[in-house]
Swiss-Prot record:
This is SsrA-binding protein. One of its GO terms (biological process) is trans-translation. It is found in: Cytoplasm. One of its GO terms (cellular component) is cytosol. NCBIfam families: PRK05422.1, smpB. Gene3D superfamilies: 2.40.280.10. One of its GO terms (molecular function) is RNA binding. It comes from the Bacteria. Belongs to the SmpB family. Required for rescue of stalled ribosomes mediated by trans-translation. Binds to transfer-messenger RNA (tmRNA), required for stable association of tmRNA with ribosomes. tmRNA and SmpB together mimic tRNA shape, replacing the anticodon stem-loop with SmpB. tmRNA is encoded by the ssrA gene; the 2 termini fold to resemble tRNA(Ala) and it encodes a 'tag peptide', a short internal open reading frame. During trans-translation Ala-aminoacylated tmRNA acts like a tRNA, entering the A-site of stalled ribosomes, displacing the stalled mRNA. It comes from Methylobacillus flagellatus (strain ATCC 51484 / DSM 6875 / VKM B-1610 / KT).
Length: 154
């Protein structure tokens, strides 16, 4: 079940590979995420000292958050992957043009997971081409619906 999606990532990047990573969260963050108070739109993933971090993910604290905890909505959160996966990602990200982007936040067996994608940036003309394809598919489906309706009425 998806909690939050980063639709902008699919618009701005070609996603080549996807990985599911665990995320290190505090208690108030888990409660806020369960209430769907999370946003991945401006988030990105970086690699530092052999570890992977999610930056810019906005988790809005609940009004009933504890008074002795200072909630930081946009703090850096560590992502959990196997060391072999991290080594593989480091090798691919160091090549020119590749980056890591968060695609989706979801539950897996009661745990909150983040799906990250190994992505290559799209040029402006690629974005326009993707938009044209999407519009054509939408138009095709509406034409087919009209055609089927007219055939059924005959």
């Amino acid at each position: 079940m998806s909690i939050a999606q980063n639709k902008k990532a699919f618009h701005d990047y070609f996603i080549e590979e996807k990985y599911e990573a665990g995320i290190v969260l505090e208690g108030w963050e888990v409660k806020a995420i369960r209430e769907n108070r999370v946003q991945l739109k401006e988030a990105y993933v970086i690699i530092q000292r052999g570890e992977i971090y999610l930056i810019g993910c906005h988790v809005t604290p609940l009004g009933s958050a504890s008074t002795h905890v200072r909630p930081d909505a946009i703090r850096t959160r560590k992502l959990l992957l196997h060391s072999e996966q991290i080594a593989k990602l480091i090798g691919k990200v160091e090549r020119a043009g590749y980056t890591l982007v968060p695609l989706d936040m979801h539950y897996t067996r009661g745990r909150i997971k983040v799906q990250i994608g190994l992505a290559k940036g799209k040029k402006q003309y690629d974005k326009r081409h993707s938009e044209k394809e999407k519009d054509w598919k939408r138009e095709q489906s509406s034409l087919m619906k009209k055609y089927v309706k007219t055939q059924a009425g005959s």
